[in-house]
């Protein structure tokens, strides 16, 4: 009986395993079609994400414009809640669709955090970020092409620091918001959780999308919610207004800092990777 209990305990302790750290530079990866397929998936997913979300923002502003003519003028629009749902819902859908191909990053900050945690190589991270930025630019470009009459009039969906808030407040909002997102990504994709909940594959995209939704509710009044440098860059490039570029650095620095903190917190506090490394070093002496 005791042996059965020990065997069961040993089996439970080995029901999952952490994948080995990704190499910093993997030249062989460049010869694999799977890498380029993943890059294409990131490009298309980010394009769709920006198209739907920015179109929602423009549509809402048009519907609530008192000077607008026609039946839309009397419509209350989707509101901030609807905009937040558009962003969170699209992330849920796109992560679910692309997770098996590229991991479903759709955000340079997420890619950066996973790179710091050695989940992806430097080569893959750089290609992902380039694809995400290009996809975002193309996605916002489609919005401008389809809604040219309203695009410039309603701000192009660009992130801007709202009046009454300091640069420090905007930066802090982006850091905290991105921390929430990337921390959720790490937790939802943790190998131990995957082993236990593998029969419910929707569980990972759901909290990630919901995190995006909640962060938008909190930070739309402050920065319009960036937490995704590609999203901010795409809107700024297509809108190309001085105000959109004035504080654009906030939407890169903030998310990257937030992602780095989330990666460190998950890897070296929650998963105690630092302790594991220390133990390995002591045994090797």
From Swiss-Prot:
GO terms for cellular component: membrane; plasma membrane; protein-containing complex
Keyword terms of this UniProt record: Cell membrane, Membrane, Repeat, Transmembrane, Transmembrane helix, Transport
Motif (NPA 1): 107-109
Keyword flag Membrane: yes
NCBIfam families in UniProt: MIP
Record's comment describing the protein's domains: Aquaporins contain two tandem repeats each containing three membrane-spanning domains and a pore-forming loop with the signature motif Asn-Pro-Ala (NPA).
Designated name of the protein: Aquaporin PIP2-5
Organism, as annotated: Zea mays
Encoding gene per record: PIP2-5
């Amino acid at each position: 009986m005791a042996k059965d209990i020990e065997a069961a305990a040993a089996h439970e302790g080995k029901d999952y395993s952490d994948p080995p750290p990704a190499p910093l530079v993997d030249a062989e990866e460049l010869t694999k079609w799977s890498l380029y397929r993943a890059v294409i998936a990131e490009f298309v997913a980010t394009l769709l994400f920006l198209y739907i979300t920015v179109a929602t923002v423009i549509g809402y502003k048009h519907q609530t414009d008192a000077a607008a003519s026609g039946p839309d003028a009397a419509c209350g629009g989707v509101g901030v809640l609807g905009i937040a749902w558009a962003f969170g819902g699209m992330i849920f859908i796109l992560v679910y669709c692309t997770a098996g191909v590229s991991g479903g990053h759709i955000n340079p900050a997420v890619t950066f955090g996973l790179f710091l945690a050695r989940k992806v190589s430097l080569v893959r991270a750089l290609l992902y970020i380039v694809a995400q930025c290009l996809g975002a630019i193309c996605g916002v470009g489609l919005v401008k092409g389809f809604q040219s009459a309203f695009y410039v009039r309603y701000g192009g969906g660009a992130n801007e620091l709202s009046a009454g808030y300091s640069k420090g407040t905007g930066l802090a909002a982006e850091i905290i918001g991105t921390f929430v997102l990337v921390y959720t990504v790490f937790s939802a994709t943790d190998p131990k959780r995957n082993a236990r909940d593998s029969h419910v594959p929707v569980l990972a995209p759901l909290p990630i999308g919901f995190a995006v939704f909640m962060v938008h509710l909190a930070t739309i009044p402050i920065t319009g919610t960036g937490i995704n440098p590609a999203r901010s860059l795409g809107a700024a490039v297509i809108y190309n207004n001085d105000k959109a570029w004035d504080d654009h650095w906030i939407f890169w620095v903030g998310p990257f800092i937030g992602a780095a903190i989330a990666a460190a917190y998950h890897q070296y506090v929650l998963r105690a990777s630092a302790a594991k490394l220390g133990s390995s070093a002591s045994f090797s002496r």
